[in-house]
A protein has these predicted regions:
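Flexible "cap/lid" subdomain of the alpha/beta-hydrolase fold that forms the substrate-access gate
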Residues: 3-34, 43-47, 91-121, 125, ...
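Conserved residues in the N-terminal Rossmann fold of short-chain dehydrogenase/reductase
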Residues: 37, 85, 280
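A generic "binding-loop/recognition-motif" signal
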Residues: 43, 53, 284
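Conserved HGGG/HGGXW glycine-rich cap/lid loop of the alpha/beta-hydrolase fold
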Residues: 46-93
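Alpha-helical macromolecular-interaction surfaces
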Residues: 71, 78, 105-108, 112, ...
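Catalytic histidine-centered segment of alpha/beta-hydrolase-like enzymes
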Residues: 284-293, 297
Length: 308
């Protein structure tokens, strides 16, 4: 396989080890992780890393941040990988000069982070909103991706159906999100198969205390999620071909995307992708990294190693 060339690095792109002792709110506990800040034009991205070896990038969902992977990343790292967990723009402890977010803003941010860290290619594991950025990366910059594992979101070539409407019932509240409104409902039925401790929810939502992060909810949905959903509805990705081996995983208790619906929406995957596999995880809902961290790590490791 040809080695991809790194893009021209922004003049100010530089990673440096961060002392997080004075960060507010404090970072949640996660033994073994190191923390860096990658500075690029107008953006200071917090990146948590663990392990050494072939790189694996984990892209969090909404409203989570890097800590969503605190039970998954160490398991992958223990198998001999360097695991990189960035706080994407509008989340966690990343800081942006501009509050605007467009459809591919996070994609360009991610490419800058990969370049600043000297990562030519990496495996990518993504969940929920993070899967939008991962999907864009695999289609537009396949040379930067080894293999992809996508959690709780169907592939880009899925067909649209009225049966999808329940999956979007939360959207109006987020499109019109008012700063200060609670998001604790994300960790309730039908999204979780298990009861999530209050302390865990508090850790996920801690960065919402920062006005910048709370204010980012509407731009994320209006500027990125809705435009990308419109592209999916128009079948844009059905006119493209995915070359990256991809595993798509759902929780059995994810009532938005049960197996019969997913199979129906994603018929004839060989027509749209070189290699696309589906798996359904027992005792898990939409929030797979919370409900089944061991299973997520094992699925990813098996997929990375298979036929390699």
């Amino acid at each position: 396989m040809d080695t991809p060339e790194l893009r021209s690095r922004p003049d100010d792109a530089r990673p440096h080890v961060a002392s997080t002792a004075t960060w507010a709110p404090p970072l949640p506990e996660a033994p073994g992780f190191a923390h860096q800040v990658v500075e690029t034009t107008g953006l200071r991205s917090h990146v948590a890393t663990i392990g050494e070896g072939e790189p694996v990038v984990l892209l969090h969902g909404f409203p989570q941040h890097w800590w969503q992977w605190h039970q998954v990343a160490p398991r992958i790292a223990a198998a001999g990988y360097r695991v990189i967990c960035p706080d994407l723009r509008g989340a966690g402890w990343t800081e942006a000069d501009e509050r605007g977010i467009e459809r591919e803003t996070r994609l360009h941010d991610l490419l800058d982070i990969l370049d600043a860290l000297g990562l030519e290619r990496a495996h990518v594991v993504s969940h929920d909103m993070g899967a939008i950025t991962a999907l864009q990366l695999t289609y537009t910059h396949p040379e930067r991706v080894g293999r992809a594992v996508q959690l709780s979101i169907p592939p880009g070539f899925m067909s649209f159906s009225p049966r999808l409407l329940p999956a979007f019932r939360h959207m109006p509240k987020l499109i019109w999100h008012r700063p200060g409104n609670a998001l604790r409902g994300v960790w309730s039925d039908p999204y979780c198969a298990k009861v999530t401790p209050d302390a865990t929810i508090d850790a996920h939502l801690a960065p919402m205390q920062r006005r910048e992060i709370d204010d980012a909810v509407r731009p994320l949905y209006r500027g990125m999620v809705i435009p990308e959903a419109m592209r999916l509805a128009r079948g844009e990705y059905q006119r493209m071909h995915l070359t990256i081996p991809t595993l798509v995983a759902f929780g059995r208790h994810d009532t938005r995307f049960n197996e019969p619906l997913v199979r129906r929406l994603c018929e004839n995957p060989d027509r749209y992708a070189d290699r696309m596999e589906f798996v359904f995880v027992e005792n898990a809902g939409k929030l797979l990294p919370d409900d089944a961290p061991d299973a997520v790590a094992e699925l990813a490791l098996d997929f990375f190693d298979r036929d390699s």
